[in-house]
UniProtKB/Swiss-Prot annotation:
Organism expressing this protein natively: Homo sapiens (Human)
Pathway: Protein modification; protein ubiquitination
GO CC entries: cytosol
Name of protein: F-box only protein 30
Pfam family, one: F-box_4
Gene: FBXO30
Annotated function: Substrate-recognition component of the SCF (SKP1-CUL1-F-box protein)-type E3 ubiquitin ligase complex. Required for muscle atrophy following denervation.
Amino acid sequence: MEEELQHSHCVNCVSRRCMTRPEPGISCDLIGCPLVCGAVFHSCKADEHRLLCPFERVPCLNSDFGCPFTMARNKVAEHLEMCPASVVCCTMEWNRWPVSYADRKSYENLSRDVDEVAQLDMALALQDQRMLLESLKVATMMSKATDKVSKPREQISVKSSVPEIPHANGLVSVDEESYGALYQATVETTRSLAAALDILNTATRDIGMLNTSVPNDMDEQQNARESLEDQNLKDQDHLYEEEIGAVGGIDYNDTNQNAQSEQNGSSDLLCDLNTSSYDTSALCNGFPLENICTQVIDQNQNLHGDSKQSNLTNGDCVASSDGTSKPSSSLAVAAQLREIIPSSALPNGTVQHILMPDDEGEGELCWKKVDLGDVKNVDVLSFSHAPSFNFLSNSCWSKPKEDKAVDTSDLEVAEDPMGLQGIDLITAALLFCLGDSPGGRGISDSRMADIYHIDVGTQTFSLPSAILATSTMVGEIASASACDHANPQLSNPSPFQTLGLDLVLECVARYQPKQRSMFTFVCGQLFRRKEFSSHFKNVHGDIHAGLNGWMEQRCPLAYYGCTYSQRRFCPSIQGAKIIHDRHLRSFGVQPCVSTVLVEPARNCVLGLHNDHLSSLPFEVLQHIAGFLDGFSLCQLSCVSKLMRDVCGSLLQSRGMVILQWGKRKYPEGNSSWQIKEKVWRFSTAFCSVNEWKFADILSMADHLKKCSYNVVEKREEAIPLPCMCVTRELTKEGRSLRSVLKPVL
């Protein structure tokens, strides 16, 4: 409180027994707290005391989040535990794999009797599948909306700079809606890169002319002494450069050798250890050639102090001179190979097959057997990369290759070998997600062979176009336009019936990497703060952890299609059981109902008697409903309008309030998020289960006696053991089977 509103004496006075007489402008009388909290203070400090009085009624700390209660200040901490606006979101996660094509048939059998038999693991898996399909549908709609907003901007920028040119193949514009913008943007980018490349080539050509005009006096004497051998090596280098194309393949077009080449300014500078001279090897498109023969010849030139500047072209490698001479001896090339490959690593010091120039032919290349035993070791440059034996093969001189889009139909495998014809869209979509996972079969299998990636086609079944037509991984399964283009044999059943996810829950920590095809599900349910601890313990700690065979035990022959299961555990009260509600997406506890109460309920359904519960006074119904948990209140509110009003009167004391936000746009163009409304609802928490007991049920062995899938296969024909497969003379002596099976030492 400001000092001018208080007296000069009262500002610093804190004594309960102050004896100062009240004087105008100096002091005032002592008073006690009107709420009888025990505080005594000067009357001018009454407003200041209200800010600290523990009995002063204040709104809840969560009043901005929707809590309507006001209480004494000393009760705020106690109220926060049951505050309807103190809401906690459960962030528990679990993972599931899509069902592989090998297990598809067995899961179809398990999903056959879902509505008749209540199974916890199946109910949770179907709930996860519905959440997955709904989330993918929302993601698809969001992506389509984004594309519609960004599409006009792209068309405006492209049409302003790129003229419309008719296609050379005589076709009309290729699907302007889907491919026009992408095609025109590609043309625009290509033109921009071409203009930038012309500027770069012009600048680098001028720099190259200045560099080549400077004489190199240090290399003139040595070049004169060994001019004959250098000329032979240069001619050999030119011969190789004329044969090699721009990407390392053979250039069969001899008519383009005199074409004008543009320098790109890239060079590969190699320093010789002996003569300290410099040499620039040929490059194509700014990258060094991967031809081992050219590298060996360049090293041999460095040994003799040759300084040569090769043409650096932006297309095919063009020879620097048109003269031809006899190829150099294969012995010099073998000497270079001797340094790269030690003779100890080869059998008898001999390279069996090496690509060598033919001395007797007309400059042609052939395979020769070269002996490296008598060749002297000379100093050459060592390679820093890992040793590879690719140069021993003829990969450099193979036929030119090209990238081509292929389909799995090129494998010439029988159509639909896995029997997937007629599956529904949901199963096919989840199979599509299973592509790169260890549990599925990918479209292609990527392998590595000596630094080369090889993709081997493995998938031999086709997927419906309704899945691949969308922009998400699985796609919008409920899209009518996509289903129209799908295979007519594919059906589209309700997602509540067919299970396409694995029943087994996988627990992977957040910090651990997950497979791309593994789906992660979050609980995401909202609870009051006092209900969260029991929910996490009972649902995630007890129920989820026991669904893999401990709480919900399935028949051992479930893989073959048996749908029988039994619940081994029940809450502490014998007869109560765990149930799952599909609409609430939550588990709950169904208490044991006496048969005395069940019979009148059946008669009420048949209309033989009136509903006695609805005839009770509203206050009595309100009192009875106060003993129910959130899960039961949600169920009761769906019975009738009267019960809905009864449950609605308990929302402030038993429910929770959730804020719904909405985006508000202003006339200026900006927008902001504001609270649209406050929604009251009950949580799905059930009463806490502190103890679990074994249910009073029959053993699984009793079911196996009458299981229709437990077919005993009787073998009447004797099958000899491996140790008994000997001649009859050894067994005619009457020896026992144990002596026959005794190992022979």
